[in-house]
């Protein structure tokens, strides 16, 4: 009995188990849901829920079930890859054209708005408007950085950069964000100096106010339109533009309000508004620097992504006895994936290679994945094949 129990424990988990599709798993999952959750399930799209139609659920319960349905949707994405292994090149080309168009109109808009804001700053003498103008100047500089980043990613020398230049993207965004945070610090210093000097500036004339309103409102409307357009892009560089456009909307509104209120009521409202913008700039873009820096140091993918990869590997081929290891970690914008699978010891090398290669291709078709490495083995009891700790500095004195 003990020997049998040991054999059962060591038996491959997938050897005699039916590889259930996401449809069967979803059906079983939905059949066990309580009534208050079933009310939220969309009958036309069973993997989607709308908890606004359900009552009696606590926030924790909603979060739990939303994660479960999100997992089912990710499994559906895997099944759709299994049904069609052909990537749509037309969609990729269309998205690339849309991204380049968004970058170009953003840069052209930044040039025009910079000229207008320089005029508004000269006319008004407001430090808050000056902060917004400096922001537009750096927008133009940073836009050049992002455009150069995009072009450098397109021109690839496979001998010099054998895995491409996708890591240029987060590096470019880090430089962009660092420049923006530096701007915030400079504006902060100037605003504090103006408060310390404590000199009341001259009042704005009606003509100056008219120009100020016209230019700043026009700039805000343009930036709002660009934000709405760029935020829909799947390109991370374009989304960086979108974030900057949204930031400009905030700085334009706050800058205009501070300048006008400072002129109408108390002069110190203007530098205080500039300080608020500076703190917002530093906080916002420092977070962007951190986010992109983390993506370059190999942070692990979230559990939902690992579940998705495991589901794909389990269902890939009936000869796969076990999925030993699934790793996914950032190395730039996308994930690098490592999967260890166990195949029968007697399986011919030609067939084993075909299974591993097709699994690698399938994983790399996921939009979140840049490269995949599939390791084949005939057992899963060996020690880890890579000793990362041996490369790390010793904690011993």
Curated annotation (Swiss-Prot):
Family: Belongs to the cation diffusion facilitator (CDF) transporter (TC 2.A.4) family. SLC30A subfamily.
Keyword Zinc among record annotations: no
InterPro entries: Cation_efflux, Cation_efflux_CTD, Cation_efflux_CTD_sf, Cation_efflux_TMD_sf, CDF_Transporter
Membrane topology of this protein: Multi-pass membrane protein
Described purpose of this protein according to its UniProt entry: Involved in sequestration of excess metal in the cytoplasm into vacuoles to maintain metal homeostasis.
TM region(s), chain numbering: 105-122, 127-147, 171-191, 209-229, 249-269, 271-291
Subcellular location: Vacuole membrane
GO cellular component: membrane; vacuolar membrane
Keyword Cytoplasm: no
Source organism of this protein record: Oryza sativa subsp. japonica (Rice)
Name recorded for this polypeptide: Metal tolerance protein 4
Ranges facing Cytoplasmic side: 1-104, 148-170, 230-248, 292-397
Keywords on record: Ion transport, Membrane, Transmembrane, Transmembrane helix, Transport, Vacuole
One Pfam assignment: Cation_efflux
GO molecular function: manganese ion transmembrane transporter activity
Disulfide cysteine pairs (residue numbers): none
Source domain of life: Eukaryota
Vacuolar compartment spans: 123-126, 192-208, 270
Ranges of biased composition (kind: Basic and acidic residues): 1-19
Positions of region (Disordered): 1-27
Gene name for this UniProt entry: MTP4
